[in-house]
Protein backbone atom coordinates (compact mmCIF):
# COMPACT_ATOMS: atom_id res chain seq x y z
CA UNK A 1 0.00 0.00 0.00
CA UNK A 2 1.48 3.36 -1.03
CA UNK A 3 2.08 5.72 1.84
CA UNK A 4 0.27 9.00 1.68
CA UNK A 5 2.20 12.23 1.24
CA UNK A 6 3.63 13.75 4.42
CA UNK A 7 1.57 16.92 4.06
CA UNK A 8 -1.61 14.82 4.21
CA UNK A 9 -0.66 13.30 7.56
CA UNK A 10 -2.46 14.62 10.62
CA UNK A 11 0.72 15.10 12.64
CA UNK A 12 2.26 17.26 9.89
CA UNK A 13 -0.88 19.37 9.53
CA UNK A 14 -1.12 19.89 13.30
CA UNK A 15 2.58 20.76 13.55
CA UNK A 16 2.25 23.37 10.80
CA UNK A 17 -0.90 24.74 12.46
CA UNK A 18 0.96 25.09 15.77
CA UNK A 19 3.80 26.96 14.07
CA UNK A 20 1.37 29.34 12.34
CA UNK A 21 -0.49 29.85 15.62
CA UNK A 22 2.73 30.74 17.47
CA UNK A 23 3.70 33.22 14.74
CA UNK A 24 0.29 34.88 14.69
CA UNK A 25 0.15 35.14 18.48
CA UNK A 26 3.65 36.61 18.65
CA UNK A 27 3.42 39.19 15.87
CA UNK A 28 -0.29 40.01 16.17
CA UNK A 29 -1.21 39.36 19.82
CA UNK A 30 -4.75 40.76 19.68
CA UNK A 31 -5.61 38.75 16.59
CA UNK A 32 -4.03 35.65 18.12
CA UNK A 33 -6.01 36.03 21.35
CA UNK A 34 -9.18 36.32 19.27
CA UNK A 35 -8.57 32.78 17.92
CA UNK A 36 -9.56 31.25 21.28
CA UNK A 37 -13.00 30.04 20.06
CA UNK A 38 -11.31 27.81 17.48
CA UNK A 39 -9.40 25.90 20.14
CA UNK A 40 -12.32 25.83 22.56
CA UNK A 41 -14.67 24.64 19.83
CA UNK A 42 -12.45 21.71 18.91
CA UNK A 43 -12.10 20.62 22.55
CA UNK A 44 -15.89 20.76 22.94
CA UNK A 45 -16.33 18.61 19.83
CA UNK A 46 -14.05 15.96 21.30
CA UNK A 47 -15.62 16.12 24.76
CA UNK A 48 -19.03 15.75 23.12
CA UNK A 49 -18.14 12.27 21.92
CA UNK A 50 -15.97 10.94 24.78
CA UNK A 51 -18.75 9.78 27.15
CA UNK A 52 -20.66 7.68 24.56
CA UNK A 53 -17.39 6.20 23.25
CA UNK A 54 -16.36 5.13 26.75
CA UNK A 55 -19.80 3.65 27.31
CA UNK A 56 -19.82 1.62 24.09
CA UNK A 57 -16.22 0.45 24.44
CA UNK A 58 -16.61 -0.74 28.03
CA UNK A 59 -20.04 -2.34 27.54
CA UNK A 60 -18.95 -4.28 24.45
CA UNK A 61 -15.67 -5.28 26.10
CA UNK A 62 -17.23 -6.51 29.35
CA UNK A 63 -20.31 -8.12 27.80
CA UNK A 64 -18.10 -10.14 25.47
CA UNK A 65 -15.88 -11.53 28.25
CA UNK A 66 -16.25 -15.16 29.30
CA UNK A 67 -14.84 -14.67 32.80
CA UNK A 68 -16.24 -11.69 34.70
CA UNK A 69 -13.54 -12.07 37.35
CA UNK A 70 -11.15 -10.53 34.83
CA UNK A 71 -12.96 -7.20 35.13
CA UNK A 72 -12.23 -6.93 38.84
CA UNK A 73 -8.66 -8.13 38.33
CA UNK A 74 -8.05 -5.58 35.59
CA UNK A 75 -9.46 -2.74 37.66
CA UNK A 76 -7.47 -3.71 40.74
CA UNK A 77 -4.18 -4.01 38.87
CA UNK A 78 -4.82 -0.72 37.08
CA UNK A 79 -5.41 1.17 40.33
CA UNK A 80 -2.30 -0.43 41.86
CA UNK A 81 -0.21 0.69 38.89
CA UNK A 82 -1.69 4.19 38.95
CA UNK A 83 -0.98 4.68 42.66
CA UNK A 84 2.61 3.45 42.49
CA UNK A 85 3.59 5.40 39.36
CA UNK A 86 1.82 8.64 40.33
CA UNK A 87 3.51 8.48 43.74
CA UNK A 88 6.87 8.11 42.00
CA UNK A 89 6.01 11.16 39.87
CA UNK A 90 5.15 13.22 42.96
CA UNK A 91 8.39 12.20 44.70
CA UNK A 92 10.54 12.92 41.63
CA UNK A 93 8.98 16.38 41.34
CA UNK A 94 9.69 16.99 45.02
CA UNK A 95 13.33 15.90 44.71
CA UNK A 96 14.09 17.95 41.58
CA UNK A 97 12.50 21.17 42.88
CA UNK A 98 14.53 20.88 46.09
CA UNK A 99 17.79 20.23 44.25
CA UNK A 100 17.20 22.78 41.47
CA UNK A 101 15.64 25.33 43.86
CA UNK A 102 14.17 27.58 41.12
CA UNK A 103 12.41 29.87 43.61
CA UNK A 104 15.30 30.48 45.99
CA UNK A 105 16.49 34.08 45.93
CA UNK A 106 13.34 35.59 44.44
CA UNK A 107 12.36 37.01 47.87
CA UNK A 108 8.79 37.79 46.84
CA UNK A 109 6.64 39.72 49.30
CA UNK A 110 3.24 37.99 49.25
CA UNK A 111 1.45 41.23 50.13
CA UNK A 112 2.64 42.84 46.89
CA UNK A 113 1.21 40.16 44.59
CA UNK A 114 -1.80 40.88 42.39
CA UNK A 115 -4.22 38.10 43.34
CA UNK A 116 -7.16 39.15 41.17
CA UNK A 117 -6.33 36.55 38.55
CA UNK A 118 -6.37 33.67 41.04
CA UNK A 119 -9.43 34.71 43.06
CA UNK A 120 -11.72 32.29 41.22
CA UNK A 121 -9.36 29.38 41.96
CA UNK A 122 -8.39 30.08 45.56
CA UNK A 123 -11.58 29.25 47.39
CA UNK A 124 -11.02 27.85 50.88
CA UNK A 125 -12.09 24.34 51.80
CA UNK A 126 -12.30 22.95 48.26
CA UNK A 127 -10.28 19.79 48.96
CA UNK A 128 -12.33 16.61 48.77
CA UNK A 129 -12.10 13.86 51.34
CA UNK A 130 -11.61 10.28 50.17
CA UNK A 131 -15.25 9.56 51.02
CA UNK A 132 -16.44 12.54 48.97
CA UNK A 133 -14.33 11.43 46.03
CA UNK A 134 -15.70 7.88 46.11
CA UNK A 135 -19.30 9.04 46.55
CA UNK A 136 -18.95 11.39 43.58
CA UNK A 137 -18.18 8.42 41.36
CA UNK A 138 -21.82 7.37 41.77
CA UNK A 139 -23.90 9.63 39.51
CA UNK A 140 -27.07 11.33 40.68
CA UNK A 141 -28.62 10.05 37.47
CA UNK A 142 -27.36 8.44 34.28
CA UNK A 143 -28.42 11.46 32.25
CA UNK A 144 -26.51 13.79 34.57
CA UNK A 145 -23.32 11.73 34.23
CA UNK A 146 -23.45 11.85 30.43
CA UNK A 147 -24.52 15.50 30.37
CA UNK A 148 -21.56 16.56 32.52
CA UNK A 149 -19.19 14.22 30.72
CA UNK A 150 -17.87 12.96 34.07
CA UNK A 151 -15.62 10.09 32.99
CA UNK A 152 -15.58 8.22 36.30
CA UNK A 153 -19.37 8.36 36.60
CA UNK A 154 -19.81 7.21 33.00
CA UNK A 155 -17.25 4.47 33.64
CA UNK A 156 -19.14 3.32 36.75
CA UNK A 157 -22.47 3.10 34.92
CA UNK A 158 -20.88 1.43 31.88
CA UNK A 159 -19.37 -1.33 34.02
CA UNK A 160 -22.75 -2.00 35.63
CA UNK A 161 -24.48 -2.00 32.24
CA UNK A 162 -21.90 -4.33 30.72
CA UNK A 163 -22.12 -6.71 33.68
CA UNK A 164 -25.93 -6.75 33.51
CA UNK A 165 -25.91 -7.39 29.76
CA UNK A 166 -23.34 -10.16 30.21
CA UNK A 167 -25.67 -11.91 32.67
CA UNK A 168 -28.44 -12.01 30.05
CA UNK A 169 -26.37 -14.24 27.76
CA UNK A 170 -27.98 -14.81 24.35
CA UNK A 171 -30.97 -12.67 25.28
CA UNK A 172 -28.69 -9.65 25.39
CA UNK A 173 -27.18 -10.30 21.95
CA UNK A 174 -29.44 -7.82 20.06
CA UNK A 175 -28.46 -5.03 22.46
CA UNK A 176 -24.80 -6.07 22.19
CA UNK A 177 -24.89 -5.87 18.40
CA UNK A 178 -26.66 -2.51 18.51
CA UNK A 179 -24.06 -0.99 20.85
CA UNK A 180 -21.23 -2.48 18.79
CA UNK A 181 -22.62 -0.85 15.63
CA UNK A 182 -23.12 2.40 17.54
CA UNK A 183 -19.45 2.36 18.54
CA UNK A 184 -18.48 2.14 14.86
CA UNK A 185 -20.62 5.19 14.11
CA UNK A 186 -19.13 7.12 17.04
CA UNK A 187 -15.57 6.42 15.93
CA UNK A 188 -16.61 7.50 12.45
CA UNK A 189 -17.70 10.81 13.98
CA UNK A 190 -14.27 11.08 15.63
CA UNK A 191 -12.71 10.67 12.20
CA UNK A 192 -14.78 13.58 10.91
CA UNK A 193 -13.91 15.75 13.93
CA UNK A 194 -10.19 15.03 13.49
CA UNK A 195 -10.36 16.70 10.09
CA UNK A 196 -10.53 20.05 11.89
CA UNK A 197 -7.84 19.17 14.46
CA UNK A 198 -5.26 21.48 12.82
CA UNK A 199 -7.72 24.38 13.10
CA UNK A 200 -8.23 23.64 16.79
CA UNK A 201 -4.50 23.41 17.44
CA UNK A 202 -3.92 26.67 15.55
CA UNK A 203 -6.58 28.51 17.56
CA UNK A 204 -5.40 27.21 20.93
CA UNK A 205 -1.74 28.05 20.29
CA UNK A 206 -2.45 31.47 18.77
CA UNK A 207 -4.53 32.35 21.84
CA UNK A 208 -1.87 31.14 24.28
CA UNK A 209 0.95 33.16 22.71
CA UNK A 210 -1.26 36.17 21.98
CA UNK A 211 -2.71 36.28 25.50
CA UNK A 212 0.37 35.54 27.60
CA UNK A 213 3.21 36.41 25.23
CA UNK A 214 6.56 34.68 24.85
CA UNK A 215 8.08 37.30 27.17
CA UNK A 216 6.29 35.86 30.18
CA UNK A 217 8.40 32.73 29.82
CA UNK A 218 11.69 34.47 30.53
CA UNK A 219 10.62 35.71 33.96
CA UNK A 220 10.16 32.21 35.35
CA UNK A 221 12.43 30.31 32.96
CA UNK A 222 14.15 28.45 35.81
CA UNK A 223 10.92 26.83 37.02
CA UNK A 224 9.85 25.96 33.48
CA UNK A 225 13.27 24.51 32.70
CA UNK A 226 13.20 22.39 35.84
CA UNK A 227 9.68 21.18 35.10
CA UNK A 228 10.30 20.28 31.46
CA UNK A 229 13.55 18.51 32.38
CA UNK A 230 11.78 16.54 35.11
CA UNK A 231 9.08 15.44 32.66
CA UNK A 232 11.73 14.23 30.20
CA UNK A 233 13.56 12.36 32.99
CA UNK A 234 10.32 10.77 34.11
CA UNK A 235 9.27 9.72 30.59
CA UNK A 236 12.64 8.31 29.53
CA UNK A 237 13.81 7.11 32.94
CA UNK A 238 10.76 5.88 34.85
CA UNK A 239 8.30 5.11 32.04
CA UNK A 240 11.15 3.96 29.80
CA UNK A 241 12.30 1.46 32.43
CA UNK A 242 8.75 0.21 33.00
CA UNK A 243 8.27 -0.21 29.25
CA UNK A 244 11.60 -2.02 28.79
CA UNK A 245 10.80 -4.38 31.68
CA UNK A 246 7.53 -5.28 29.96
CA UNK A 247 9.05 -5.88 26.55
CA UNK A 248 8.60 -2.69 24.54
CA UNK A 249 10.49 0.52 23.81
CA UNK A 250 9.24 3.87 25.09
CA UNK A 251 10.81 5.58 22.06
CA UNK A 252 8.97 3.32 19.63
CA UNK A 253 5.73 3.84 21.54
CA UNK A 254 6.17 7.61 21.33
CA UNK A 255 6.74 7.34 17.58
CA UNK A 256 3.61 5.20 17.28
CA UNK A 257 1.43 7.82 18.99
CA UNK A 258 3.17 10.86 17.47
CA UNK A 259 0.03 12.17 15.75
CA UNK A 260 -1.87 12.16 19.02
CA UNK A 261 1.06 13.81 20.82
CA UNK A 262 1.08 16.70 18.35
CA UNK A 263 -2.65 17.07 18.88
CA UNK A 264 -2.15 17.12 22.66
CA UNK A 265 0.66 19.64 22.25
CA UNK A 266 -1.51 21.95 20.19
CA UNK A 267 -4.53 21.82 22.49
CA UNK A 268 -2.71 21.40 25.86
CA UNK A 269 -5.29 18.73 26.68
CA UNK A 270 -4.59 15.00 26.80
CA UNK A 271 -8.35 14.49 26.65
CA UNK A 272 -8.41 15.76 23.06
CA UNK A 273 -6.77 12.56 21.82
CA UNK A 274 -8.53 10.07 24.12
CA UNK A 275 -10.67 8.39 21.41
CA UNK A 276 -7.66 7.89 19.13
CA UNK A 277 -5.57 6.57 22.02
CA UNK A 278 -8.17 3.92 22.79
CA UNK A 279 -8.23 2.78 19.17
CA UNK A 280 -4.43 2.75 18.90
CA UNK A 281 -4.00 0.71 22.07
CA UNK A 282 -6.40 -1.88 20.66
CA UNK A 283 -4.45 -1.82 17.42
CA UNK A 284 -1.25 -2.44 19.40
CA UNK A 285 -2.64 -5.70 20.75
CA UNK A 286 -4.41 -4.75 24.00
CA UNK A 287 -7.87 -6.28 24.44
CA UNK A 288 -10.85 -3.96 24.18
CA UNK A 289 -12.04 -4.72 27.72
CA UNK A 290 -8.68 -3.66 29.20
CA UNK A 291 -8.43 -0.54 27.05
CA UNK A 292 -11.98 0.44 27.96
CA UNK A 293 -11.22 0.22 31.69
CA UNK A 294 -7.64 1.48 31.91
CA UNK A 295 -7.64 4.50 29.58
CA UNK A 296 -10.69 6.38 30.97
CA UNK A 297 -9.73 5.57 34.57
CA UNK A 298 -6.18 6.72 33.90
CA UNK A 299 -7.45 10.16 32.96
CA UNK A 300 -8.35 10.70 36.63
CA UNK A 301 -5.99 8.38 38.50
CA UNK A 302 -2.84 8.34 36.38
CA UNK A 303 -1.89 11.95 35.62
CA UNK A 304 1.88 11.69 35.94
CA UNK A 305 2.67 15.09 34.44
CA UNK A 306 0.14 16.79 36.71
CA UNK A 307 1.63 15.01 39.74
CA UNK A 308 5.12 16.31 38.91
CA UNK A 309 3.72 19.81 38.39
CA UNK A 310 1.83 19.87 41.70
CA UNK A 311 4.80 19.15 43.95
CA UNK A 312 7.18 21.37 41.99
CA UNK A 313 4.79 24.33 41.86
CA UNK A 314 3.90 24.11 45.56
CA UNK A 315 7.53 24.00 46.72
CA UNK A 316 8.52 26.70 44.19
CA UNK A 317 5.95 29.09 45.67
CA UNK A 318 7.27 28.34 49.15
CA UNK A 319 10.84 29.00 48.00
CA UNK A 320 9.96 32.22 46.19
CA UNK A 321 8.02 33.63 49.16
CA UNK A 322 10.59 32.45 51.74
CA UNK A 323 7.99 30.21 53.38
CA UNK A 324 9.63 27.59 55.64
CA UNK A 325 8.84 24.12 54.33
CA UNK A 326 10.77 21.44 56.20
CA UNK A 327 10.79 17.71 55.47
CA UNK A 328 7.74 17.05 57.63
CA UNK A 329 5.73 19.74 55.83
CA UNK A 330 6.80 18.38 52.45
CA UNK A 331 5.84 14.82 53.36
CA UNK A 332 2.45 16.08 54.57
CA UNK A 333 2.02 17.98 51.30
CA UNK A 334 2.97 14.83 49.38
CA UNK A 335 0.36 12.72 51.18
CA UNK A 336 -2.37 15.30 50.59
CA UNK A 337 -1.44 15.59 46.92
CA UNK A 338 -1.76 11.81 46.58
CA UNK A 339 -5.47 12.37 47.19
CA UNK A 340 -6.11 15.74 45.55
CA UNK A 341 -4.19 14.85 42.37
CA UNK A 342 -6.92 12.30 41.63
CA UNK A 343 -9.35 15.19 41.23
CA UNK A 344 -7.60 16.50 38.13
CA UNK A 345 -9.07 15.53 34.78
CA UNK A 346 -7.14 15.47 31.51
CA UNK A 347 -8.32 18.93 30.51
CA UNK A 348 -6.55 22.25 30.21
CA UNK A 349 -6.03 24.07 33.50
CA UNK A 350 -7.19 21.27 35.81
CA UNK A 351 -3.74 21.01 37.40
CA UNK A 352 -3.79 24.67 38.43
CA UNK A 353 -7.27 24.27 39.95
CA UNK A 354 -6.18 21.24 41.99
CA UNK A 355 -3.05 23.09 43.15
CA UNK A 356 -5.16 26.05 44.29
CA UNK A 357 -7.55 23.76 46.16
CA UNK A 358 -4.67 21.93 47.83
CA UNK A 359 -2.88 25.09 48.99
CA UNK A 360 -6.18 26.51 50.24
CA UNK A 361 -6.82 23.42 52.34
CA UNK A 362 -3.26 22.91 53.63
CA UNK A 363 -2.57 26.52 54.59
CA UNK A 364 1.23 26.12 54.85
CA UNK A 365 2.09 27.64 51.48
CA UNK A 366 0.48 31.05 50.75
CA UNK A 367 -2.29 30.72 48.17
CA UNK A 368 -1.50 34.23 46.95
CA UNK A 369 1.75 32.79 45.60
CA UNK A 370 -0.26 31.19 42.80
CA UNK A 371 -0.10 34.60 41.13
CA UNK A 372 3.59 33.91 40.47
CA UNK A 373 2.89 30.99 38.16
CA UNK A 374 -0.47 32.04 36.72
CA UNK A 375 1.19 33.65 33.69
CA UNK A 376 3.24 30.58 32.75
CA UNK A 377 0.81 27.86 33.79
CA UNK A 378 -0.59 27.66 30.26
CA UNK A 379 2.91 27.01 28.88
CA UNK A 380 3.57 24.32 31.48
CA UNK A 381 0.25 22.73 30.56
CA UNK A 382 1.74 21.31 27.36
CA UNK A 383 4.37 19.30 29.24
CA UNK A 384 1.76 18.15 31.76
CA UNK A 385 -0.59 16.95 29.03
CA UNK A 386 2.13 15.18 27.02
CA UNK A 387 3.47 13.38 30.10
CA UNK A 388 -0.05 12.39 31.16
CA UNK A 389 -0.79 11.03 27.70
CA UNK A 390 2.40 8.99 27.39
CA UNK A 391 1.90 7.73 30.94
CA UNK A 392 -1.57 6.41 30.13
CA UNK A 393 -0.29 4.77 26.95
CA UNK A 394 2.36 2.88 28.91
CA UNK A 395 -0.15 2.00 31.66
CA UNK A 396 -2.57 0.44 29.18
CA UNK A 397 0.00 -1.88 27.65
CA UNK A 398 1.49 -2.81 31.04
CA UNK A 399 -1.85 -3.62 32.68
CA UNK A 400 -2.91 -5.54 29.57
CA UNK A 401 0.23 -7.66 29.87
CA UNK A 402 -0.37 -8.24 33.59
CA UNK A 403 -3.88 -9.48 32.73
CA UNK A 404 -2.66 -11.72 29.88
CA UNK A 405 -4.73 -9.53 27.58
CA UNK A 406 -1.91 -8.31 25.34
CA UNK A 407 -0.91 -9.80 22.00
CA UNK A 408 2.86 -9.28 22.36
CA UNK A 409 3.56 -10.36 18.79
CA UNK A 410 1.04 -7.84 17.48
CA UNK A 411 2.41 -5.11 19.77
CA UNK A 412 5.99 -5.62 18.61
CA UNK A 413 4.94 -5.69 14.96
CA UNK A 414 2.99 -2.44 15.32
CA UNK A 415 5.67 -0.62 17.32
CA UNK A 416 8.36 -1.79 14.90
CA UNK A 417 6.19 -0.61 11.99
CA UNK A 418 6.19 -4.10 10.48
CA UNK A 419 2.45 -4.29 9.74
CA UNK A 420 2.27 -3.88 5.98
CA UNK A 421 -1.32 -4.97 5.41
CA UNK A 422 -3.93 -3.25 7.52
CA UNK A 423 -6.45 -5.91 6.57
CA UNK A 424 -4.57 -8.42 8.76
CA UNK A 425 -6.24 -7.08 11.87
CA UNK A 426 -9.59 -5.27 11.90
CA UNK A 427 -8.84 -3.35 15.13
CA UNK A 428 -6.91 -0.61 13.38
CA UNK A 429 -6.39 3.10 13.29
CA UNK A 430 -6.54 3.73 9.60
CA UNK A 431 -3.82 6.34 9.16
CA UNK A 432 -3.80 5.87 5.42
CA UNK A 433 -7.54 6.22 5.27
CA UNK A 434 -9.01 9.64 6.00
CA UNK A 435 -8.04 9.47 9.71
CA UNK A 436 -11.13 7.42 10.55
CA UNK A 437 -10.82 5.06 13.50
CA UNK A 438 -12.93 1.92 13.20
CA UNK A 439 -12.55 -0.64 15.99
CA UNK A 440 -14.07 -4.07 15.63
CA UNK A 441 -15.15 -6.66 18.17
CA UNK A 442 -15.32 -10.08 16.49
CA UNK A 443 -16.77 -12.13 19.33
CA UNK A 444 -20.52 -12.21 20.11
CA UNK A 445 -22.08 -12.69 23.49
CA UNK A 446 -22.34 -16.34 24.37
CA UNK A 447 -24.65 -17.96 26.87
CA UNK A 448 -22.59 -18.40 30.02
CA UNK A 449 -25.37 -20.10 31.96
From Swiss-Prot:
It is a multi-pass membrane protein. It is found in: Cell inner membrane. GO terms for molecular function: fumarate transmembrane transporter activity; malate:proton symporter activity; succinate transmembrane transporter activity. Gene3D superfamilies: Sodium:dicarboxylate symporter (1.10.3860.10). GO terms for cellular component: plasma membrane. The chain crosses the membrane at residues 5-25, 45-65, 77-97, 149-169, 185-205, 231-251, 298-318, 332-352, 353-373. One of its GO terms (biological process) is L-aspartate transmembrane transport. Keywords: Cell inner membrane, Cell membrane, Membrane, Symport, Transmembrane, Transmembrane helix, Transport. It holds the Pfam family SDF. Responsible for the transport of dicarboxylates such as succinate, fumarate, and malate from the periplasm across the membrane. Belongs to the dicarboxylate/amino acid:cation symporter (DAACS) (TC 2.A.23) family. This is C4-dicarboxylate transport protein. The gene is dctA.
